[in-house]
């Protein structure tokens, strides 16, 4: 019986550790994705500021 308890404890502990590692990696991936989106947005804003005021890329006849 003691062997089963120790085995169960070990399995649960290793599962918890692997779950924690996966969650940490997921969080890091989300942070990197957010940084990429922010960089993309800031780059778009910089590109928009280079245009003169009232400029439209569409031709109006």
UniProtKB/Swiss-Prot annotation:
Keywords, sorted A to Z: Amphibian defense peptide, G-protein coupled receptor impairing toxin, Hydroxylation, Secreted, Signal, Toxin, Vasoactive, Vasodilator
Entries under InterPro entries matching the protein: Frog_antimicrobial_propeptide
GO terms, biological process: defense response; vasodilation
Keyword field contains Zinc: no
Source taxon at top rank: Eukaryota
Modified residues (4-hydroxyproline): 53
Removed propeptide positions: 23-50
Gene Ontology molecular function, alphabetical: toxin activity
Principal subcellular localization: secreted
Residue stretches of biased makeup (Basic and acidic residues): 37-52
Entry GO terms, CC: extracellular region
Subcellular location: Secreted
Designated name of the protein: [Thr6]-bradykinyl-Val,Asp
Tissue: Expressed by the skin glands.
General function of this protein: [Hyp3,Thr6]-bradykinin: Induces relaxation of rat smooth muscle from tail artery (EC(50)=56.7 nM) and contraction of that from ileum (EC(50)=588 nM), urinary bladder (EC(50)=4.6 uM) and uterus (EC(50)=3.9 nM). Binds to both bradykinin receptor B1 (BDKRB1) and B2 (BDKRB2). In arterial smooth muscle, the effect via BDKRB1 is stronger, in uterus, ileum and urinary bladder the effect via BDKRB2.
UniProt keyword annotation of Electron transport present: no
Composition skew (Acidic residues), residue ranges: 26-36
């Amino acid at each position: 019986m003691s062997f089963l308890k120790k085995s169960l404890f070990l399995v649960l502990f290793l599962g918890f550790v692997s779950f924690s590692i996966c969650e940490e990696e997921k969080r890091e991936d989300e942070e990197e994705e957010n940084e990429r989106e922010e960089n993309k947005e800031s780059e778009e804003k910089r590109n928009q500021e280079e245009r003169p005021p009232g400029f439209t890329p569409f031709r109006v006849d």
